[in-house]
């Protein structure tokens, strides 16, 4: 196998190819096009264009192959895999993800038993549901609201992700689902907090099919066409170089050959997800007090109902038509401080509970409800790293410390009652009781490299996402979010990345102007 040629020096080195890392590449391509950018991704390219969502792969076998190749250092090429979290005590990973093998639960703690990762170009954005709601109430970041920046950054995030609310407008039962939910939920809500269409990173092609956004959409043609941008897949960054207290580049290993190279850089952006970003900083000897702390996930409760008064849509031959979310769309019940959970309602491909053989579900008639709960933030909830043991990539092994507080248990109990109430408004429950997913199932890990206004030991980075005490080093992704959120965090994570990327672009262009 030929040796890969890495650049000796670039202006910006980006670690990770998910939406946040892609945001840095896109903003820099737009605002500082002369800057040389190298993006490093430990996983392989599994879709075309690189970073595209696997849902856009029409062939089912090819799509499954792409998912398997995303499943980490021990990914299999064959069909011998177990996927999909089910209603059991087993630890299982969704297709396209792989579980933390050990260290997911400390003795006497709740842990995150199904904490998971994806290793592929595009990260989890090649496998996600695409929900992009804006944060509300205490989910919002106060110091960015005070400057009037947050909503503009969120709007920019929506542009980059290709967020729409009309992709499912033709869904025959979407309006009915919203009407039934609104009838029991909207009376006590402000107008912008009422039941509504879910903002989604998806659009519908003129010829009909849906196209789901991945990092390919965030990168866009401008980044792919930028001669100064290069994406290196199957490239493991093992250390951030620091000289005279400032980030100076990265050490990268070619996963295919094992060869190691130093790549010098003026700026380093670590966007490796909320667990592997602090892992890389730790491995580099960059260890602020808050690193890995304030880890938070969203407890997830699910419930399924059969829609009342449901008539399947049929084609010209009388055959029922179906497809994920094509009947009922995706409905959003926003988080509020009074109702501290985020609701997502959509058609299920199939019932999560086996129906009687003589009572088959009409295609599209089964609606799934999910409520995501905001976590009670605790500094003791953290990811710690070993100085001796390593993971499958040879990086410091993780140990998660995670405990639900009394407040968390109360929120979950309240959400269980709420989801039954909402479900009964739509249809007839398939099960009397809602199901609490294993902790970690949301995949919405946050807080481990959190943003703050001051270097006070309670945050890792500044509002520009620059790591305290390590100029030139930036962190990106959901781990930067400093608040407890119940909504899907991707849009917020991208919005914060926009601010950091603009800061780097401004520094680069200012330097060029001074020459």
UniProtKB/Swiss-Prot annotation:
What SUPFAM superfamilies does the entry give? FAD-linked reductases, C-terminal domain, FAD/NAD(P)-binding domain
Q: Which Pfam families match?
A: GMC_oxred_C, GMC_oxred_N
Q: Where is the composition biased (Basic and acidic residues)?
A: 62-82
Q: Tell me the residue numbers annotated for binding FAD.
A: 41, 118, 120, 124, 129, 131, 237, 478, 490
The UniProt record lists the keyword Flavoprotein = yes
What EC number(s) does its UniProt record assign? 1.1.3.50
Signal peptide range in chain numbering: none
What keywords are assigned to this protein? FAD, Flavoprotein, Oxidoreductase
Active site at 444 (proton acceptor)
Q: Which InterPro entries match?
A: FAD/NAD-bd_sf, GMC_OxRdtase_N, GMC_OxRtase_C, P2Ox-like
Q: Where is this region: Disordered?
A: 62-90
Which reaction(s) are listed as its catalytic activity? isoorientin + O2 = 3''-dehydroisoorientin + H2O2; mangiferin + O2 = 3'-dehydromangiferin + H2O2
Asked if the record carries the keyword Transmembrane helix, the reply is: no
Q: Which cofactor does it need?
A: FAD
Entry's cofactor comment = Binds 1 FAD per subunit.
One term of GO molecular function: flavin adenine dinucleotide binding
Q: Which family does it belong to?
A: Belongs to the GMC oxidoreductase family.
The job of this chain, per UniProt, is described as: FAD-dependent C-glycoside-metabolizing enzyme that participates in the degradation of certain C-glycosides by catalyzing the oxidation of the hydroxyl group at the C3 position of the sugar moiety. Shows oxidase activity toward C-glycosides such as isoorientin and mangiferin but cannot use carminic acid, puerarin, orientin or aloesin. Shows weak activity (100 to 1000-fold lower) with O-glycosides. Probably plays a crucial role in the metabolism of C-glycosides in nature.
User: How is this protein organized at the quaternary level?
Assistant: Monomer.
Q: What is this protein called?
A: C-glycoside 3-oxidase
The organism named in the record is: Microbacterium trichothecenolyticum (Aureobacterium trichothecenolyticum)
- Where is the organism placed in the taxonomic lineage, from the top? Bacteria, Bacillati, Actinomycetota, Actinomycetes, Micrococcales
Q: Which gene encodes it?
A: carA
């Amino acid at each position: 196998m030929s040796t890969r040629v890495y650049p000796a020096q670039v202006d910006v080195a980006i670690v990770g190819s998910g939406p946040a890392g892609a945001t840095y590449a896109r903003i820099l391509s737009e605002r500082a096009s002369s800057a040389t950018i190298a993006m490093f991704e430990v996983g392989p390219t599994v879709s075309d264009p690189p970073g595209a969502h696997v849902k856009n792969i029409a062939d089912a076998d090819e799509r499954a192959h792409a998912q398997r190749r995303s499943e980490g250092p021990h990914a299999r090429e064959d069909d011998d895999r177990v996927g999909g979290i089910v209603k059991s005590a087993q630890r299982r990973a969704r297709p396209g993800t792989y579980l933390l093998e050990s260290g997911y639960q400390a003795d006497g703690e709740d842990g995150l038993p199904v904490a998971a990762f994806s290793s592929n170009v595009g990260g989890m954005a090649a496998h996600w549901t695409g929900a992009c709601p804006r944060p509300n109430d205490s989910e919002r970041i106060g110091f960015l609201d005070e400057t009037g920046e947050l909503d503009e950054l969120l709007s920019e995030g929506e542009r980059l992700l290709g967020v729409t609310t009309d992709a499912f407008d033709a869904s025959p039962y979407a309006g009915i689902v919203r009407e039934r939910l609104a009838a029991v939920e909207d009376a006590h809500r402000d107008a912008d907090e009422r039941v509504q269409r879910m903002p989604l990173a998806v659009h519908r092609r003129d010829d009909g099919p849906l196209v789901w956004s991945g990092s390919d959409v965030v990168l866009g043609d401008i980044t792919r066409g930028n001669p100064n941008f290069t994406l290196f897949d199957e490239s493991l960054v093992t250390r951030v170089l620091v000289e005279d207290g400032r980030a100076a580049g990265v050490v990268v290993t070619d996963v295919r050959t094992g060869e190691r190279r130093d790549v010098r850089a003026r700026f380093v952006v670590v966007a490796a997800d909320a667990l592997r970003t602090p892992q890389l900083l730790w491995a580099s000897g960059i260890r602020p007090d808050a690193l890995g702390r304030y880890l938070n996930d969203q407890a997830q409760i699910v419930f399924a109902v059969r829609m009342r008064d449901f008539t399947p849509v049929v084609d010209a031959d009388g055959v029922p038509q179906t497809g994920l979310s094509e009947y009922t769309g995706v409905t959003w019940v926003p988080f509020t401080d009074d109702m501290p959970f985020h609701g997502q309602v959509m058609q299920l491909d199939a019932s999560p509970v086996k129906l009687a053989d003589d009572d088959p579900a009409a295609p599209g008639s089964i609606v799934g409800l999910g409520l995501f709960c905001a976590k009670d933030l605790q500094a003791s909830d953290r990811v710690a790293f070993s100085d001796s043991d390593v993971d499958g990539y040879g990086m410091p092994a993780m140990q998660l410390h995670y405990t639900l507080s009394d407040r968390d248990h109360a929120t979950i109990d309240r959400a269980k009652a709420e989801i039954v109430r909402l479900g009964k408004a739509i249809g007839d429950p398939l099960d009397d009781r809602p199901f609490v997913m294993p902790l970690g199932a949301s995949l919405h890990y946050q807080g481990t490299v959190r943003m703050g206004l001051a270097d006070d030991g309670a945050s890792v980075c500044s509002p520009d996402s620059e790591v305290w005490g390590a100029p030139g080093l930036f962190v990106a992704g959901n781990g930067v979010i400093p608040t407890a959120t119940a909504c899907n965090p991707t849009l917020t994570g991208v919005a914060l990345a926009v601010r950091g990327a603009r800061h780097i672009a401004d520094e680069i262009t200012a330097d060029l102007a001074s020459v």
